[in-house]
């Protein structure tokens, strides 16, 4: 049983869309796979809130309405509950800055991942925000991925500035000593010029294969995205024989 970690160059770059595409593609190969989002936020956009004055209103860290988690549930063929594939959902963003952030227990995340690894062939673990985003005051998602020695898939939202973000993230993944299985290009800005040139340059600079290109789509979370993923051999390093 194996798990791998999917991260992105930023927030809103299409991590969950890429997760759906990978899950669907591997299921088409007969692999039993589920997604796991250990920490989810009901909003990842930059919204000003006065945390000191809104602790009570924003303290619902066990809600079950995160769209990313719900998309992961709908993407797998397995019958999973919200609680099974999510350890914490916050109604506010970045709980590290709030009292509620203290409720995140790494031990619970470890146990939830171990439970999924024991039950399913493969577990796609989707991070939140970017690679070095803190989980608490002393620990970030990159640290947690390293503690489990999970190989990494990087989602690059193709936009202005993505070259710098992508290369810095790749460098940090390498510094953590984790293998980069590959990267996925997600076209989040249909009007961006030089798209092909950006893909070519990233392919030249990143020492890992391009696993797929997801075009700009309307409601991609409702579509069959498997056809956009290739180089599946990079994602099937795990055992692919189901237990009897």
Curated annotation (Swiss-Prot):
GO terms for cellular component: cytosol. It is found in: Cytoplasm. Its cofactor is Mg(2+). The active site is at residue 37. Its EC number is 6.3.3.3. InterPro entries: DTB_synth_BioD (IPR004472), P-loop_NTPase (IPR027417). GO terms for molecular function: ATP binding; dethiobiotin synthase activity; magnesium ion binding. The keyword Magnesium applies. Keywords: ATP-binding, Biotin biosynthesis, Cytoplasm, Ligase, Magnesium, Metal-binding, Nucleotide-binding. Pathway: Cofactor biosynthesis; biotin biosynthesis; biotin from 7,8-diaminononanoate: step 1/2. Mg(2+) binds at residues 16, 68, 126. ATP binds at residues 12-17, 68, 186-187, 215-217, 222. It is an enzyme of class 6 (ligase). Catalyzes a mechanistically unusual reaction, the ATP-dependent insertion of CO2 between the N7 and N8 nitrogen atoms of 7,8-diaminopelargonic acid (DAPA, also called 7,8-diammoniononanoate) to form a ureido ring. Belongs to the dethiobiotin synthetase family. Homodimer. This is ATP-dependent dethiobiotin synthetase BioD 1. It comes from Pasteurella multocida (strain Pm70). The lineage of its organism: Bacteria, Pseudomonadati, Pseudomonadota, Gammaproteobacteria, Pasteurellales. The gene is bioD1.
């Amino acid at each position: 049983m194996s798990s791998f970690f999917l991260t992105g160059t930023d927030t809103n770059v299409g991590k969950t869309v890429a997760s759906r595409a990978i899950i669907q593609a591997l299921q088409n190969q007969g692999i039993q796979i589920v997604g796991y989002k250990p920490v989810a936020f009901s909003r990842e956009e930059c919204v000003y809130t006065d945390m000191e004055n809104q602790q009570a209103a924003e303290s619902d860290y066990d809600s079950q309405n995160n769209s990313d988690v719900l998309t992961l549930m709908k993407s797998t063929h397995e019958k999973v509950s919200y609680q099974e594939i999510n350890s914490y959902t916050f109604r506010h963003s970045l709980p590290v800055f709030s009292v509620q952030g203290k409720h995140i227990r790494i031990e619970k995340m470890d146990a939830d991942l171990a439970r999924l690894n024991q039950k399913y062939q493969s577990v796609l673990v989707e991070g939140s925000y970017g690679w070095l985003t803190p989980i608490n005051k002393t620990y970030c998602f990159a640290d947690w991925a390293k503690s489990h020695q999970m190989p990494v898939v990087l989602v690059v939202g193709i936009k202005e500035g993505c070259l710098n973000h992508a290369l810095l993230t790749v460098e940090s993944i390498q510094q953590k000593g984790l293998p980069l299985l590959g990267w996925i290009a997600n076209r989040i800005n249909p009007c961006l010029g030089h798209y092909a040139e950006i893909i070519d340059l990233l392919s030249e600079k990143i020492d890992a294969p391009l696993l797929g290109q997801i075009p700009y789509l309307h409601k991609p979370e409702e579509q069959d995205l498997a056809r956009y993923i290739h180089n599946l051999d990079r994602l099937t390093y795990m055992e692919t024989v189901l237990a009897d």
